[in-house]
């Protein structure tokens, strides 16, 4: 099963890699393809083309390299509408003040002028920042692998407590207005039984 999931991911990676950056980037974050959306939604929104949404932004950097294009899309979509929004809401909910020093205006204005070769290369990420860090910090810190803040949702969803909690939400009257609840429960059951890793899809619907 694990091997088959890896094959699917590898195949999708190769398919995306064969497409133009304007077609594949941002599409990487899709949780459901068109067929899956048609199955779970009672009133599907029809064929959705993310290129229509991103085109005005890609047009502004059409003469730039692919890395710069992806960064521009990230800044205008993912950064503003996703990760910063979530961090702000979750930190405020727990009375925490969160700061993002790398988004300081002066730091950002310097970073945006860097040639792509100093941002990332074939063997290193955040190349310029790591080289700067090497001057002041131990190598084990400056060269440390990037880590996010993942939580074990995949494991939690197999726990009876959380499985039942989400199943209750998926079969509720509110969910039934918008979703084909049998399809949602199918995703949940497949995950709990270890037949597929549906954790991100389940979490997307639940949230």
Q: Which residues does each predicted region cover?
A:
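Short, small-residue-biased leader/transition segments that mark boundaries at the very start
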Residues: 1-8
